[in-house]
Amino acid sequence: MAQHRRTLEYPVSKIDRELLNAVYELDYGKVQTALDNGADPNCLDEKGTHIIWSAIGIFSEYQDKFDRRQHKVKRENAEAILSLLLSYGSDPDGGITASDTKHSTPLMEVCYYLEIRIAKLFLQYGADVNHVNDGHTWLDHLYDENMFMEFRRDDNNEDKDELDDRQRRLDRMFALAEAHEAEYFKNLNKNEKE
């Protein structure tokens, strides 16, 4: 007798399905309507994937300089939708808990793609900067990327303009990390004095 494997599927309510579809379509108006009508900003799709991961998916698709320019409107829509979801209480860690050390957080993911404005959003909404994935924090991922850039510069097959653009974005991401860390310690010292 053949055994049939049943894939675990998570139930998705009608209003959450509308929200998920609107995010997939990058339709800000429909996202707003679904949220206003009670959709869960922390809903999961049928596979159990948190909606934040769907919202940042566009940034992994269009990575090189040409693609980023070509798909500027899509990227801007995705950023606006992500901001809206977060403002409605969506988890900036995309359902990843501190005890889950096998998965990266959305902040780590956008750092990998050097999406500074998206990283700022996650930091603004309280993303876990201390999360460790395979022994690395989001800052460790930036340092790894910086080291990788050195190897790529030594490779004569790489497009110099593309590498320069990536290095500029990496430098801006480090500046964001330093500013965030400085703000954290400033607030920590302020709280200790009180």
Language-model region placement:
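Ankyrin-repeat-protein effector appendages
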Residues: 2-14, 125, 143-194
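Ankyrin-repeat boundary/"N-cap" motif
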Residues: 9-21, 44-69, 95-109, 132-148, ...
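Flexible, glycine- and charge-enriched loops at secondary-structure boundaries
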Residues: 24, 67, 71-78, 163, ...
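Conserved ankyrin/ankyrin-like repeat signature
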Residues: 30, 77-81, 117-118, 166-173
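Ankyrin repeat domain, specifically the short helix-to-loop turn at the C-terminus of the second helix
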Residues: 32-40, 82-92, 120-128, 174-183
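Alpha-helical adaptor scaffolds
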Residues: 53-56, 74-75, 79-100
